[in-house]
Amino acid sequence: MKVLLFTLVLCPATVILFGQPVSREIKIKKGQTYLNLPISNSGKLVRARIKYDGTALDQFTIKLAEANPDYWAFFDVTAYQGKSIFMEIENYIPPNFGGAQAVTPEVNVSVAPSRKGLDLVYADSKFQGQDSVYRERDRPQVHFSSRRGWINDPNGLVYYNGEYHLYYQHNPYGWEWGNMHWGHAVAKDLLHWEELKEAIFPVLDIKPEGSRGDAAFSGSAVVDPMNTSGFRKNGIDPLVAFYTSTGRGECIKISYDNGRTFIDYTGNPILKHNGRDPKVFWYAPGNHWVMVVWDSGMPKKMSLGQEASLRQHSICTSPDLKTWTYQSGVGGFFECPELFELPVEGQPGVSKWIMYDAHGRYVVGGFDGKQFTVGQPLKKYDNGGGYFYASQTYNNTPDNRRIQIGWGRNITHPGMPFNQAMLFPTELKLKNTFDGLRLCPTPIKEISTLHKNSQTVEDKVVTSDAPVTLAVNKESAIHVVAEFERGDAPITLNVLGYELNYDNEWEFSTVAAAGTAAPITPAGPFTPPTTLVPVTYVKSGTDMFKIEAIVDKNIIEIYVNDGELYYATLFNGKKTGKVEASVRTGGGGGGGRGIKRKYIVKKMEVHELKSIWPEN
């Protein structure tokens, strides 16, 4: 999710005011790899530049602490050992995103800022807090989060040269949204992520009149083994990233070193329009590339010579990744588009195409390489309170699985040096259900490699006075898989204090939080739900019912009947040390009062989960 509703439509009246800069020379000694930056979450915002030999290496806004930092951010200076770099700061008044200047009386841009925060900056062989990173009190242990700063949309998901790449929207210099870079992590198993340096930076020399400058917004990445682009060099088929450069348009970046660093394509921008978030993939039947990109629908012609409809996903094609032709659009969607094909489970040789947006709204239909045909009404992929957002699926997976990662929007971590997390990777399947074809996620099979201290019960009868209970470590991340045979009573599965209720009388489940979440204060420009709304799911008529849950610190993800219902939410309740299946005393069927009701637990597995993070 982004602050700018229309990425490339900038109000001419918008003026960003800067003050007199204050500069400091910092000599980077041999062995020093990080420039440590003190952060105060309540500090004043200044604009900073880090320079070498007169050229800006990065430019960002930051709340420099003048004393007693809340935490420390860092900038990698490995390449500048034995050299001097300069850091300068200046007072800064950010633009009001409605177009009016947000002048505040406490900021006077005509004077230089205090240099107290600048004087606390230092270079070292470690970043501040490195010895305790990944072991912080509230760090999720099986969900990816950055070492420092804010993260949101997953970007550029691609398998390349033996690694799964996870790029993501990242503010490396603050706990709130802003300074959009592409952060970068890699894993060989989709679990054990190694965070690397920032991969894509804002372009620093963009200064059009009235512009907010540049940010590296969301996009995707592909491999071009047929060299349709002509980008191959020295036998290397590069990683090619597509992203929205907010000051330019849709742009290409090229990497020849396994996605670690990127160079700018000289023909950028490849597309200028009122939109963002290009997802690119190869369409083999047509022997061409496809880009699905969100269009805001402002009354302006695309440079391709076609008119965009209101809030549509536009489909463009290209023979070479560089020249694009508008083909069609599907209206009613908002940002972060996806388009992919999936086989229909249980129907050999039958497949359908799925188009979805950031909110998890999707349609199933057909695609001929140029036009998407809607085959059934819009459905909602995530059924929770909006904590699942901006998901993307992997290109080029070696086993053809459709692997998805979403952003756990507004799952905040107050008091920590990081903020937000990615949701657990899932495999998507297309299933025939009571209401037609449904997109169904389940945790990737690799989760089993994290299991420890596993417990299993089978064929247990649950009655109103005899629940089935398993004790667990409430501080550990856990994975629960429970299968029930329908009885004559409603049943509750309590996972560390989070209640999941199934009412068999009406043959539907109500998955609800029972006093587990408190209202939260949004960090950045996002408004999270302040209450948890029960989720209703009509079951398919079978006598078996399955609930799967992953609980990790303040994150809980629920999968019902192998993903026929899915949702993620914030878990702020007081945790218990148990997983318990019990019969509810009210509602449901089974006759009158005084009759002992029962339910059958066919199988209930509870696994504690090993951390995905390395030990320091």
Question: Which residues fall in each region the model found?
Answer:
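Bacterial Sec-dependent N-terminal signal peptides
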Residues: 1-21
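Beta-rich accessory regions
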Residues: 20-38, 43-54, 77-79, 83-98, ...
